[in-house]
Regions:
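Bacterial N-terminal signal peptides that target proteins for export
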Residues: 1-11
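Mature soluble binding/inhibitory domains
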Residues: 21-156
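Bacterial N-terminal signal peptides
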Residues: 9-19
Length: 156
């Protein structure tokens, strides 16, 4: 009988924990773990690397970008991306786009590069370090590309 009661108690506690919103299960202050579009505001310097694999032979990709997030779901950027050692047709390629950040600090972005055969670029991302760091992966068939960004200190 004690075993049944213990099993029922464990089952009840497990059910409650599974049904509880993730914010209730997090340790620490809720404000420390909650994200939204407002979490990304300002300029971020990106380092990009990977490969375009939807070709007879993979094309290596290396680049940098400066992206400005407006805190409301819109972004603008310039990038310099080298494909297999070939310089881009425009030194600093401009782009615009949108992004959405979920409460758990995951999100997505879409970048539109006018005139580019690679546009749009669809990203999945994770925001960390209180909105000061971003990790991304291109979420589009044929790409194996990741990037890391840090917020640019505008106080200088």
């Amino acid at each position: 009988m004690l075993t049944n009661r213990l099993a029922l108690t464990l089952f009840t506690l497990t059910t409650i924990a599974m049904a509880a919103p993730p914010a209730l299960l997090a340790s620490g202050n809720d404000d420390d773990t909650r994200c939204s579009n407002r979490t990304l505001r300002g300029d971020f310097a990106f380092h990009i690397e990977g490969a375009f694999v939807d070709a007879p032979m993979p094309l290596l990709i290396r680049g940098v970008a400066m992206t400005r997030f407006d805190g409301r779901g819109r972004l603008s950027q310039v990038d310099h991306v080298v494909f297999n050692g070939m310089l881009p047709p425009v030194d600093w390629t401009p782009a615009t786009g949108t992004y959405h950040i979920n409460a758990d600090c995951t999100g997505e972005a879409e970048i539109i590069i006018p005139g580019s055969p690679f546009s749009p670029v669809t990203l999945r991302l994770v925001v960390g370090a209180d909105g000061r760091r971003i990790e991304t992966v291109v979420s589009k068939p044929g790409y194996d590309v990741t990037s890391t960004a840090v917020k640019v200190d505008s106080s200088r």
